[in-house]
Amino acid sequence: MKEAAGPVRGPTISDLSVEEIMTKNVITVETEEPVFTMVKKMINKNVECLPVTKAGKLKGLITFRDVIRKVVYEGKDPKKMKAKDVMTKSVVTCYNDATVLDVVKLMKNKRLRRIPVIDRNRNLVGLVTNFDLAIIGWDVD
């Protein structure tokens, strides 16, 4: 007698590529942009963080918290400081072909709320956030 096979299942949410759920057309800032201009951009576009790029390559990430800590708290002039002076340089990233499961594990292990998505040439192609994951029913917190 032949053994019955289990149910055939299609791809699950965890098998999705991060490219399918990430935010594309991310608002960025160049390394030489003044912090004052950058903050206006963040407020006008209603975003909490901006990837910092140079010629399309990811160089860092800036959050409102970075601006408060490194500019406001230290009493520095936001018109004289550049994005490169405030950005976090060692940014955790993922590749655009990573699975959602890979990204969820990374976010949980590193306690992150957002991860820039890059291609194999280090070009920024998107940003995946805990909100992007929540939309597909995945809670990272």
Labelled PLM ranges:
Residues 1-141:
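Tandem CBS (Cystathionine beta-synthase) repeat/Bateman regulatory domains
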